[in-house]
Amino acid sequence: MAPGALLVTSQNGRTSPLYDSDGYVPAPAALVVGGEVNYRGYHHAEWWVGNAKQVAQFYITRMGFEPVAHKGLETGSRFFASHVVQNNGVRFVFTSPVRSSARQTLKAAPLADQARLDEMYDHLDKHGDGVKDVAFEVDDVLAVYENAVANGAESVSSPHTDSCDEGDVISAAIKTYGDTTHTFIQRTTYTGPFLPGYRSCTTVDSANKFLPPVNLEAIDHCVGNQDWDEMSDACDFYERCLGFHRFWSVDDKDICTEFSALKSIVMSSPNQVVKMPINEPAHGKKKSQIEEYVDFYNGPGVQHIALRTPNIIEAVSNLRSRGVEFISVPDTYYENMRLRLKAAGMKLEESFDIIQKLNILIDFDEGGYLLQLFTKPLMDRPTVFIEIIQRNNFDGFGAGNFKSLFEAIEREQDLRGNL
């Protein structure tokens, strides 16, 4: 071991070198992690976008986020700018290049920045604005990373420590479906606003002083769309490399309309704090919403992120007041739902009339119910959107709403000429 190598002790009690003077010291190929690694939840989602500052402002003014940290020319980042916004437990990072990808520009960049700049421009050209990375906070980065790589995951960055005056953070990253990545984050002693290298935002955005608040709790789940016959391989990756299990699934018999269909499997971390639904298209008369996404995103990627709220009526009302556009649900859905709720003896705490007025969808079983609503796509490409969700003793994913939801999205698809 090289002098000065950093040692990290994993949950199984094994002390390993994280890196030495020549770089990361890889784990044995046959490594099996002892014990179950604890996933703490989603740490953040990073979006690669054309103009990070403007996109951050959209989430601040439209969705009630607050600016918490940034990185850019002012902090010594010469080629990229990142703006971090947060709403309670929901963190989004928006990153853009601030220099051209022209060769003469790249000559001045370190090799790592050259590669990242090239990748970012390729990503923006291929996908448009989209989610590049979904980051998980874990108790043991070393164990999660080693287990993933030993079971076939492709490394993006090996475990390393970033330090600043506010403490240390250990992180690593792997590839998942398409061009999407997962970063593992372990906040060992860190007390800062986001991650080392970011500067805290000290002022509150003035727009939020004049707009109704939006109370979000956390990222509930993050959905990935796959191309034809790719769902099984994606789910196998989460089982094999990350120790996830199949939590819930529906097939094309359950999610179909007159024109199109899809299949979906929800993958969950062992402790069920992280859930990653995986969709793929199924055969129908016309193009499904999954096919439309894959066509315009040019491959698999994150379709939507569900944000949990304790009060969806207040959240959706205030989001609408701020200018957020949601899908429309026909009155016939609510006529049928009122009868279903009455037949099942299910009583909602919320006013049914207000739920209908706001176009909120309802699903339920004998134990509880779920309220949810979906925004329209957030950019001109019909790709990524946001879900607002409230759970009342209900762990499902709105299977009872899939047909109505699919039909609502198809109406938007038809307006775009993509059905």
UniProtKB/Swiss-Prot annotation:
Organism domain of life: Eukaryota
Keyword Lipoprotein belongs to the record: no
UniProt GO MF annotations: 4-hydroxyphenylpyruvate dioxygenase activity; metal ion binding
VOC domain segment(s): 41-187, 218-376
Cofactor(s) listed: Fe cation
Binding site for Fe cation: H221, H304, E387
Protein name: 4-hydroxyphenylpyruvate dioxygenase
Cystine residue pairs: none
Gene3D superfamilies reported in the protein's UniProt record: 2,3-Dihydroxybiphenyl 1,2-Dioxygenase, domain 1
The record's free-text note on cofactor binding: Binds 1 Fe cation per subunit.
Pathway(s): Amino-acid degradation; L-phenylalanine degradation; acetoacetate and fumarate from L-phenylalanine: step 3/6
Catalytic activity from the UniProt record: 3-(4-hydroxyphenyl)pyruvate + O2 = homogentisate + CO2
Keywords, alphabetical: Dioxygenase, Iron, Metal-binding, Oxidoreductase, Phenylalanine catabolism, Repeat, Tyrosine catabolism
Similarity section: Belongs to the 4HPPD family.
PANTHER family associated with the record: 4-HYDROXYPHENYLPYRUVATE DIOXYGENASE
Enzyme Commission number(s): 1.13.11.27
Coiled-coil stretches: none
Metal-binding as UniProt keyword: yes
One GO process term, biological-process aspect: tyrosine catabolic process
